[in-house]
Amino acid sequence: EDCKPLEVNNDTRWKAGVFNKDKPQEDEDSDEVITKKALLILNKLSLTKFDKLSDDFIATGIGKNEKILHDIIWTIVGKAQDEPHFAAMYASLCLKLSQTPLELEADAPKKGKKFKKLLLERCQQEFETNTAEKIADATKDVEDEEEKAYQAGLVKKHYIGHMRFIGELYRADLITIKIMLFCLPALLEGETTF
């Protein structure tokens, strides 16, 4: 049989969103668009481009409402856990965000408190989760011992990354000595360790 090339159907083929004129454009101020823009900038963030990109990150409007702020905080904490060598950079970004007045705090007497409160709640929630249980959850459906060890290693890496991020938040004065004094005995007793 003779093979002929596939025919291109311009009506149904995939087109990049930028070039797709038929697709209705999303509202620039929608939560989804703001979150996407912020995540794109966050993925480009590095120590050399920190000043410019952190300003761009704040300018996206992440302080418009609590849902966007919540999603962004979860992402920042997750990235700090995955990339512990950049924990200081993410802590600096958090410091800059806490010092920036957010739109949702327009009527609040103290600016920056909402971000800091949500960040500390997320860090506390992550700190208080039992790492042994997280390892058990991650490896319960895995049969291969090598894969189990890999999954357990990932959970431990996240845990260590989170501890480093907490330390960097303390160095940036976002966490008080009182909180650190609460964390240290828990770490030294071995209750939350693996």
Please provide the spans of the model-predicted regions.
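Alpha-helical interaction scaffolds
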Residues: 1-194
